[in-house]
């Protein structure tokens, strides 16, 4: 821990808390996980990959092409908008999208990395006893998406070990 009395700006060394819920012994870079972050001036939570996970997202792209209705069904069952959950992350700029990919799945198809995050979080919720319930409901809402992606990550790990 840093002694702030010797710094010019007196800022704390650690100004936020980051919790991630992922499988034990799984490398962070390849991991799909839920997270919760609390900072001095922000708070958020969601689901996603730590970094770009090209193999897993390539599998998602193949699934979108092969079974768009199944992927849409999973996303619809999450009711992301109803829970104020929003897709974020970066997208490929020049990745060709097959004509068979429906318009509503194109952002998912083009994802280079992604996360689904709660938006509209108010800072005062950090002091509200309903916070745990809010986070739990959002995590449960994202569970179908987690299961879809988790299956893909597990398949990749099994393939790489074989």
Which residues make up each language-model segment?
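Short, charge-rich amphipathic segments
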Residues: 1-7, 30, 66-84, 131-135
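Acidic-enriched, low-complexity/disordered segments with a strong bias for Aspartate over Glutamate
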Residues: 9, 15, 29, 41, ...
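Long, solvent-exposed, polar/charged low-complexity segments
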Residues: 85-162
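General "foldedness" signal
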Residues: 14, 33-35, 50-52, 57-63, ...
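Generic detector of bulky aromatic hydrophobic side chains
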Residues: 25, 70-71, 136, 143
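A short, surface-exposed loop/turn module that caps and links secondary-structure elements
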Residues: 1-13, 17, 82-97
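Compact, glycine/acidic-enriched structural inserts
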Residues: 38-99
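Aromatic- and glycine-enriched beta-alpha-beta binding-site module
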Residues: 3-65
């Amino acid at each position: 821990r840093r002694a702030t009395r010797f710094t010019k700006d007196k800022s704390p060394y650690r100004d936020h808390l980051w919790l991630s819920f992922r499988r034990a012994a799984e490398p962070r870079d390849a991991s799909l996980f839920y997270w919760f972050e609390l900072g001095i001036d922000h708070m958020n939570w969601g689901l996603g990959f730590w970094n770009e996970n090209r193999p897993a997202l390539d599998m998602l792209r193949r699934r979108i092409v092969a079974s768009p209705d199944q992927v849409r069904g999973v996303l619809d069952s999450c009711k992301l908008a109803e829970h104020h959950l929003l897709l974020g992350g970066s997208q490929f700029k020049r990745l060709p999208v097959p004509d068979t990919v429906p318009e509503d799945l194109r952002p998912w198809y083009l994802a280079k990395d992604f996360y689904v995050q709660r938006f509209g979080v108010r800072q005062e919720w950090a002091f509200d006893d309903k916070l745990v319930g809010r986070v739990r409901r959002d995590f449960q809402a994202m569970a179908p998406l987690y299961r879809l992606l988790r299956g893909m990550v597990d398949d990749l790990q099994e393939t790489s070990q074989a």
